[in-house]
């Protein structure tokens, strides 16, 4: 046996990224007009909203949550409303500060989102409706839109820095 201690990942100064867990954090389904809505023959309208949130849980440990809301209406009556939060816990160490926000806003949601899509489609199908398969999302484009909107808002307020979704500050 060797007397050398094994180093934990990320302790050697090298960048380290690990998925600890992906889990369904919250899920709700509302069908306020059932069972009568099943008798409607008109095609439903579908509205989808997706958002991303990130928070630090401990040193080098982050939770990234992808929030999805699907609202389907038939003749202005809500057929169903699904709200879901799919989260992942990520171990991220020795990553330069300027790369953390894109990692939390692009890479992590890209990993978590397929689980959210699956859970939403499954829930809608189990509720008696045709499953809705959410489209793929380009989280880089979404991140860049949020960054541009935040920069514009900051500029209008006369500020000099940018506060990102995780609470950190970035400058332009």
From Swiss-Prot:
One of its GO terms (biological process) is protein transport. It is found in: Cytoplasm. The keyword Protein transport applies. Keywords: Chaperone, Cytoplasm, Protein transport, Translocation, Transport. GO terms for molecular function: unfolded protein binding. Gene3D superfamilies: SecB-like (3.10.420.10). GO terms for cellular component: cytoplasm. Its main location: cytoplasm. Belongs to the SecB family. Homotetramer, a dimer of dimers. One homotetramer interacts with 1 SecA dimer. One of the proteins required for the normal export of preproteins out of the cell cytoplasm. It is a molecular chaperone that binds to a subset of precursor proteins, maintaining them in a translocation-competent state. It also specifically binds to its receptor SecA. This is Protein-export protein SecB. It comes from Ralstonia pickettii (strain 12J). The gene is secB.
């Amino acid at each position: 046996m060797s007397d050398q201690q094994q180093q934990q990942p990320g302790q050697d100064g090298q960048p380290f990224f690990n998925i600890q867990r992906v889990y369904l954090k919250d899920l709700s389904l509302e069908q306020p007009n059932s069972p009568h809505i099943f008798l409607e023959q008109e095609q439903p309208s579908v509205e989808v909203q997706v958002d991303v949130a990130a928070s630090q849980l401990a040193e080098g440990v982050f939770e990234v949550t992808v929030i999805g809301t699907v609202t389907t209406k038939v003749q202005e009556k809500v057929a169903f409303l699904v709200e879901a939060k799919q989260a992942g816990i990520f171990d991220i160490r020795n990553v330069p500060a300027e790369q953390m926000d894109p990692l939390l806003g692009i890479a992590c949601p890209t990993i978590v989102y397929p689980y959210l899509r699956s859970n939403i489609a499954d829930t809608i199908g189990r509720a008696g409706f045709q499953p809705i398969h959410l489209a793929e999302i380009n989280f880089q484009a979404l991140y860049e839109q949020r960054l541009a909107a935040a920069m514009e808002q900051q500029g209008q307020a006369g500020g000099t820095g940018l506060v990102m979704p995780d609470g950190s500050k970035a400058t332009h």
